Structures are given as C-alpha cells and as structure tokens.
Amino acid sequence: YSQRCGFVVYGGWPAAMEISEVSLAGEAGGEAFRLPVRATVLSGGVGSTAATHPYRMMMGRAWTLLKSGNLKQLLLKAKRYRAGKPGTHGDVVAAVRRQLEKNNCSRFMLVLDHDLGGGANNYREGLIRERMADGCGTLLLSFHLLSLQYSLEICTPGGRQRFSISGLDVLISLAEEGLISESFYNNAVSFEHPEDVPDLLVTLRSVYAIPLTLAMHDYYPICPSHFLLDASERYCGVPDIETCSDCLPKIDFWFVSFFESRDIRLWRSKWGACLESADSVLCFSNATRDLLLRAYPDLNTDRIDVVPHATGFFPARKPKLDMSTGLHIGILGEIGPHKGCDIVKALSEEIVTQNAATRISVIGTLEADCDPAVVTETGPYEASGLVDLVEASGANVFLFPSIWPETFSYVVDELMQLDVPIVCFDMGAPAERLRHYPKGKLIPLANARDILSQLKVFHEELARPMVIGE
C-alpha cells in the first residue's frame, strides 16, 4: 500500500481482461511480491472495487479541505485515520488469558466500533473508562481503513495492547474459551463485509449465551447508507422496501460499497435477526426509536431502551446577542458533508446573489470553499470558550444545518445551554429537542433561497430594540 511503502505502481489493460494476480518482480534477483488485487487494482480507470472506494472518498474530502484552506483540519483528520493501526500478529487468545489473570478478571466485555472519530468513539471510550475504573478490561474490535485489517485491542487499567487479526473468527475462539462476558455493538460503519457483523453477534448470543447490547449511534442496522441518505444524497425517510431496493445499488458514497451485494432485503434480514436477539437496543432519542420501528415494525419494543446522552456543558453565563444588527447566521461544530457543508456553501452563494448584508460565522470548521467576505471560520473550539466565541462572532441566529436525522446532537445541546435562537431541519433528535425549546424553529430542508428567507423571518420575529442576554 502506498501509504506504507512510499511508492505507487500503476498500469492499464483491456477492460474485458480478468485480472487474477498482480506481482512485482525484481529484474536483478528475480524476487517476486504478490499484490492483493482487491486492495490495489483500480479497474476501468475509476477504482470501482469496494476496497478502494474509501480511499477515493478520503482523497475527495482531503481536496475539499485543501481548497478551503483547512490545512490544520486536514492534518488532524490524517493523524486520526493513521492512528489505530493494527499491531503485531500473535496468539490473541493467549494474550487475553494473560491479561485476565494479570488484572484478576474472569472475562472481558467485547466492544465493536469503527475508528472514524466523532461521538460514537467518544461514547465507546467512556465505556472503556468505566470498565477500567471497576478494575476490569475491554476487548475493542475495529477495522483499520488504511491497512484494511481488523484489529483487536486489549484495554486494561495497566495499558492497551493492539493485535492484528485475520477476521471475525478470532472472536468465536475467544467465546469458545469463555473469555467474553458481554457484547456491545457500538458501530460497524467502515467494516469490511459488514453483513458478517450481525451474524457474528447472533452467534455469540445464541450459541454462547453472551448478552448483547446494540447502540443506535446512526442507522447502520437499517441501511448501509448509515445516515439514511438516498442516491441523491437527501434524507430518505425510510420508505417502503421496494424503493430501498431500487435506491441502494445506485449509492456510491460513504462506505455503502463495502456491502457488495447491495441487497437491502438481505441486509434487513441479517440485522433484523440481530436486533431480535439483542437483550437491549439502546436509542438516544425517541426519533431514532420511531425510525427503527419504521424499518422493523415487528421488533419487540420491550427490548428498546431510550436513554438520551448525558451532557456536561453548563456555561457560567449566557452570551449577549445583538439582534439590531440584522441577520447574522451562526453555525457551530465540525461541518462536513452530512453535517451540511453544502447547505452552508449554497447559503453563502445566495447571500452574494442577493447582495445581502447577512454574514455567516462558523464556530468550528467547514469543509467547503466559501466567499471569505460572507463566511468566517474560527477553527476547532473548546466548549469552555463558547460564550466568548459566540459574542465575538456577532451571530444572533444559529443554524444547525445537518442533512440527516441525527440520533442525538451535542452541538444542539450546547446551543440550548447557551440559550440562543436555533433553527434546524425538521428531522431526527435535534428537531425532537427543539420542538419544545422556546427559541427553536423547525423548517423543511429546502433550497438555499427558501432557507435564507425562513432565517430572515425568524430573525425579524425575534428582533427588538434591545440586547438579548444578561
């Protein structure tokens, strides 16, 4: 792989030719090195194999960050993706036994999670810390994208040790040895052959009686398009299965390509069995529960637990917002494609088209190239500094531009704690929260002109010859 060896080999051949093996051969000594075709061959000039799609996706996002001048953010993302590289090969079962004896534990909890960052990873790390505080350990199964390998990390109070494993069968071996106390599915987005994950969890539950909890951080158990975005990259609303069957093969973004069959009936069959076998399906909002039941109407609701995330942001004071200066849109967070960066870009272009005085302040980062006369960006922030950042920005109405029905939003919670006006699209957990928030407004996901118009109307409703706040 180019990211490890430092060079790239490329070539071409007739499209009709089937490639079964590619090797590098040294001219002098004749040494040969076989290349893994699935991971290296770009066919038809576009890299259409499932294994290469994440690389193309990440390159596209990297180019977007470069164009927008977000070099620091690009470096942070690159560092995150390179982290978590699988460690040494070895006898994992023996290593787990040694750590159990060393920590005086009988069994470890197994956690399945991606390594893509974000709220799901933060939640997982919280679980691991809780186990460590109790003197116990955790087995963390992940899939490392840059090396296309599974890793199993043994996490104990004494440290963390990461192993490279060949596949999911290793977990069956650990179960046979009685080394797993419970399974916790956190997230499997980006896992290779993701349809094998529910089969594994069902086996651990049914054959080895290992209790299972599934956490709904996104909608992966409903669809490989885990944000529920259809082929046109719009929220689908979980339609009938025929519509899904027509849509899924057309989707070419995110990690959908890892599910090579693109058969939504097969996907729902496997994940439906997994959901039925779970002891608890953990939802962080009623909106998530409702969408899950729309996809699986026969699912036993007794096993669904709605438990909102605990939040710890309580500002010492509320920011002062000046409503007399005209509409100034504030946006908080790390705004990538599914978080609405295209919405922000379209809004900025509409502001230019209308020659409006409206400005947009992004407190955080934005993966879009916008007119700097309209859009300013602070870069990453700490919650402790939010009050000062909000006041310094001049923003007086905040837009939450996410285009998918988020299962929970820490950003919305932070904005509510700041007691500022918030606008979001009428979907998911954010809408559920803002529906009962005095300074909240729900709007349909529409074109930039309509969104800007709704924001202006909301600002006019709020505007008075006074300063809101303390």
Task: Name each region found by the language model.
Residues V387, V412-Q417, A431-E432:
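Short alpha-helical segment that forms part of, or immediately flanks, the ligand-binding pocket
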Residues Q99-L100, N104-C105, V111-G126, S190-E192, ...:
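A short, glycine/small-residue-rich beta-strand->loop->alpha-helix junction that serves as a flexible
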